């Protein structure tokens, strides 16, 4: 049924590294072994790529959700760029790159609340039972990460205005190329 979608763990891992290995880097942290995973994920892992989705409507494209580390936490943990509650310009660039990959991909775009403002749960990967202090959204980040929020708004506008990215069928599949290859 094309109306039932799956969370695409393949692109999640390609973007930021495995959620089960805290120090593993994904493509945004410089791990080039995940380049093909980004290419497949951008096309919602459909058609020839041995995944469950037959069309973009069945693929939820994401980098983080309520399970496991936030995107910013995974970047910090795998790179040691800063403490969780510190702004790292390199980590911000990686967060922006992840946002670009999600929004430049076919499928249903999903983002964890606060991803656009580099939300942290201070490395807690199983926070359902953690304190409100860990789980709350730090509203000061609206100011501290205003540039990232603006960037994400732009990404969303681009995606909304570009039909090949919002199409939920395989009409545009063959139009995706990466450096001249598919």
Regions found by a protein language model. Give the residues of each.
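Aromatic- and acidic-residue-enriched segments that line the glycan-binding/catalytic groove
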Residues: 123-133
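Catalytic cores of eukaryotic secretory-pathway lumenal/extracellular enzymes that build
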Residues: 1, 135-138
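Short amphipathic alpha-helical patches
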Residues: 125-126, 141, 175-182
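Core nucleic-acid recognition elements
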Residues: 120
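Conserved alpha/beta catalytic core and glycan-binding cleft of carbohydrate-active enzymes
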Residues: 1-113, 117, 128, 163-165, ...
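Catalytic cores of secreted or luminal carbohydrate-active enzymes
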Residues: 138-172
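Residues that flank catalytic or metal-binding motifs in active/ligand-binding sites
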Residues: 58-59, 133, 151
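Non-catalytic scaffold segments within catalytic domains of secreted glycoside hydrolases
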Residues: 77-86, 133-134, 141-145
């Amino acid at each position: 049924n094309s109306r039932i979608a799956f969370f695409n763990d393949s692109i999640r891992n390609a973007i930021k590294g495995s959620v089960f290995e805290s120090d593993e880097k994904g493509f945004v942290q410089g791990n080039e072994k995940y380049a093909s995973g980004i290419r497949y994920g951008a096309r919602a892992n459909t058609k020839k790529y041995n995944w469950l989705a037959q069309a973009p409507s069945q693929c939820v494209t994401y980098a983080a959700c309520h399970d496991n580390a936030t995107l910013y936490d995974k970047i910090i943990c795998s790179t040691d760029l800063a403490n969780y509650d510190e702004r790292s310009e390199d980590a911000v660039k990686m967060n922006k790159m992840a946002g670009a990959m999600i929004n430049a991909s076919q499928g249903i775009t999903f983002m964890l609340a606060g991803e656009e403002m580099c939300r942290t749960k201070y490395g807690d990967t199983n926070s359902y039972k953690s304190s409100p202090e860990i789980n709350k959204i730090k509203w000061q980040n609206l100011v501290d990460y205003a540039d990232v929020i603006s960037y994400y708004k732009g990404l969303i506008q681009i995606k909304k205005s570009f039909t090949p990215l919002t199409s939920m069928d395989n009409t545009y599949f063959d139009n995706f190329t990466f450096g001249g290859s598919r």
